[in-house]
Curated annotation (Swiss-Prot):
PROSITE patterns: AMIDASES. Heterotrimer of A, B and C subunits. The lineage of its organism: Archaea, Methanobacteriati, Methanobacteriota, Archaeoglobi, Archaeoglobales. It is an enzyme of class 6 (ligase). It comes from Archaeoglobus fulgidus (strain ATCC 49558 / DSM 4304 / JCM 9628 / NBRC 100126 / VC-16). It holds the Pfam family Amidase. It catalyses: L-glutamyl-tRNA(Gln) + L-glutamine + ATP + H2O = L-glutaminyl-tRNA(Gln) + L-glutamate + ADP + phosphate + H(+). One of its GO terms (molecular function) is glutaminyl-tRNA synthase (glutamine-hydrolyzing) activity. GO terms for cellular component: glutamyl-tRNA(Gln) amidotransferase complex. PANTHER family: GLUTAMYL-TRNA(GLN) AMIDOTRANSFERASE SUBUNIT A, MITOCHONDRIAL, TRANSAMIDASE. Belongs to the amidase family. GatA subfamily. This is Glutamyl-tRNA(Gln) amidotransferase subunit A. The active site is at K66 (charge relay system), S141 (charge relay system), S165 (acyl-ester intermediate).
């Protein structure tokens, strides 16, 4: 559902009744897209809107927030047993901005535990089902954020993207999802997985709605030292672009058939060529070494003492610390902590972590060279259609599914997933990658492409 459609509904029946209807839909849903539904708070805000007390660009609009983004007084669990009882005492920067613009936070969206996964199957609260086929996953790690848009269980949503975690569910659910340039959106209040890679971003049913949400959440925040201090304003533009197909990024036959059809549509207006990125064959391995290394450091703070999951005290601090973490973290999180600790250990730091950072430099160099020739680069967002639940039981197979998305995070570039129709009743996404702070170009190009495929409907 788009903002324009929601406003028509509110105008005809009032915000309270419209929100009540959405809450009823969520309650009956089998998707498991929410961890926490903010029923009472949402209805109070809807009443304020009906009384004319709610103002702003998002006034009266229901927004879902991924459950690794801090919301004051509302459970923020990271889909983990470790934080299953954690209620933050502050709002994330992006949540502050939502509230300033009158948005209604309708709930906290389900996700992979600590954002570690591609299918939302690692969530302590259970898998998110795909609205197009409930036997399949909605993608990850922001699976709930994608599913709620596709199922009309929210009008807008926020996700976070460390290696494709917005773009993957956007592709699998047939909606729009943007991973902004690193630093455009403040990460203050985002519970960290891998600080140098992740970014908060918007998901929506149309480019106009996506752009509006980005306008709201982008901008200066001194509490995030990596924040670029730049605002964003969407400005329509209509120009012929130089579009590069990345040779090293592809997919299976079903995905490539639809991708090639999209390329032919793009050729009708834009100049299309092919570009090779030699470093990409090393990008996936480098990404996981860096991400897991940062995760092992970030997650060291969960000790069962100050907040979150705790146990009865034991006679030994070391035993207590180990037992809390063994019971509080799921298998995938423990696997990544272990591998990250190994990569950072004294004997292997140079062999793994430093080498991965050198690959990262090569990836950035390849992108820089490509953007000297092309305005945007394209690929399939995901190399396959949405997986069946349980299909990716092997961790390595799950990691390989991120092959098209992780280079963007290594370079800190913006990337958009655009729905380009269905194959066998399942959505396919086109990934559009831009140069630093070229979100306006991406969104305009994405709008043009999306309109030719029915805007994802």
């Amino acid at each position: 559902m788009r903002i324009a459609e929601w406003k028509e509904k509110v105008e005809s029946q009032g915000c309270y009744d419209a929100v009540s209807e959405m809450l009823e839909r969520i309650e009956k849903s089998r998707l498991n897209a929410y961890i926490t539904v903010c029923k009472d708070e949402a209805l109070k805000m809807a009443e304020k809107y009906d009384r004319g007390e709610l103002k702003g660009r998002l006034a009266g609009i229901p927004v879902a927030v991924k459950d690794n983004i801090s919301t004051k007084g509302i459970l923020t669990t990271c889909a983990s047993k470790m934080l299953s009882n954690y209620r933050p005492v502050f709002d994330a920067h992006v949540v502050e901005k939502l509230k300033q613009e009158g948005a209604i936070i309708i709930g906290k969206a389900n996700m992979d535990e600590f954002a570690m996964g591609t299918t939302t199957e690692t969530s302590y609260f259970g898998v998110v089902r795909n609205p197009h086929d409930e036997a399949r996953v909605a993608g990850g790690s922001s699976g709930g954020s994608g599913a709620v848009i596709a199922a009309d269980e929210a009008v807008l949503s926020l996700g976070s993207d460390t290696g494709g975690s917005i773009r993957c569910p956007a592709s699998f659910c047939g909606v729009y999802g943007l991973k902004p340039t690193y630093g455009l959106v403040s990460r203050y209040g985002l519970i960290p997985y891998a600080n140098s890679l992740e970014q908060i971003g918007p998901m929506a049913d149309s480019i106009e709605d996506l752009a509006l949400l980005l306008e709201v959440i982008a901008g200066k925040d001194t509490r995030d030292s990596t924040n670029a201090g730049r605002e964003f304003r969407f400005e329509p533009e209509d120009r012929k672009l130089r579009v590069g197909i990345i040779a090293e990024m592809g997919g299976n036959d079903d995905v490539m058939k639809r991708f090639n059809e999209a390329v032919e549509v793009i050729r009708e207006k834009h100049e299309v060529g092919e570009v090779s990125m030699p470093s990409f064959k090393y990008a996936l391995a480098a990404y996981y070494i860096i991400a897991m290394s940062e995760a092992s450091s970030n997650l060291a703070r969960y000790d069962g003492v100050r907040y979150g999951f705790a146990l009865e005290k034991l006679d030994s601090w070391r035993r207590y610390f180990s037992k809390v973490r063994a019971e509080g973290f799921g298998d995938e999180v423990k696997r990544r902590i272990m591998l990250g600790s190994y990569a950072l250990s004294a004997g292997y730091y140079g062999k793994y972590y430093l080498k991965a950072q050198k690959v990262r430099t090569l990836v950035i160099r390849d992108f820089k060279k490509a953007f000297e020739e092309y305005d945007v680069l394209i690929s399939p967002t995901m190399p396959a259609l949405p997986f069946k639940i349980g299909e990716l039981a092997d961790p390595l197979t799950m990691y390989k599914a991120d092959v098209n998305t992780v280079p963007v995070n290594l370079a800190g570039l913006p990337a958009l997933s655009v729905p380009v129709g269905m194959v066998k009743g399942l959505p396919v996404g086109l990934q559009v990658i831009g140069n630093y702070f070229s979100e306006n170009t991406l969104l305009n190009f994405g709008k043009w492409v999306g309109e030719r495929f029915g805007e994802g409907d």
